[in-house]
Design a protein with these regions (language model features):
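Long, contiguous interaction/targeting segments characteristic
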Residues: 10-11, 45-48
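Short tyrosine-centred short linear motifs in exposed loops/low-complexity segments
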Residues: 19, 53-54
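Short hydrophobic beta-strand motif reused across regulatory alpha/beta modules
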Residues: 30-31, 56, 65-66
Length: 141
């Protein structure tokens, strides 16, 4: 099977809003902007601006961005911003205090832990403050 660099795909469930993809994109084809603080962000990819360099895919820590095998079509410069992928990445909420937080996808946990157990997944459903409090409370002093 011949694989080639194609159109960028985006999985908003995997995105942790680190904005690395936008930072490493030499063409400026990725824009992440706040819609409502602590609630949601717009994630936009301008396909006609993309040079298909693959930097976003390579540096994305969760695999939220991938290059597909669907060949992108060439379009005139006047249509530069017309072919887009737009998604809204929404914050989740802490299972304990219900404060807004960025969800930690399973792919990210698999990169950090050898095995994923229920205590680990439940711990990462907590915001950083509640996670610290929970971990500190479990320590024997």
């Amino acid at each position: 099977m011949n694989a080639y660099k194609g159109k960028i795909t985006f999985n908003k469930e995997q995105c942790v809003l680190c904005q690395t993809c936008a930072f490493v994109c030499p063409a400026g084809a990725i824009n992440i902007s706040c819609v409502e603080p602590q609630k949601s962000y717009d994630f936009i990819i301008w396909h006609n601006t993309c040079t298909v360099c693959g930097n976003c895919t390579y540096f994305c820590p969760t695999g939220a961005i991938a290059l597909s095998n669907t060949l992108a079509e060439a379009t005139p410069q006047s249509e530069k911003y017309t072919s887009i992928t737009a998604n809204m990445v929404e914050y989740g909420e802490c299972a304990n205090c219900h404060e807004p937080m960025i969800n930690v996808p399973l792919t990210m946990l698999k990169r950090g832990f050898k095995t994923i157990s229920e205590p680990i997944t439940s711990l990462f459903k907590l915001c950083p403050k509640c996670r610290r409090d929970h971990t500190f409370a479990k320590r024997a002093l």
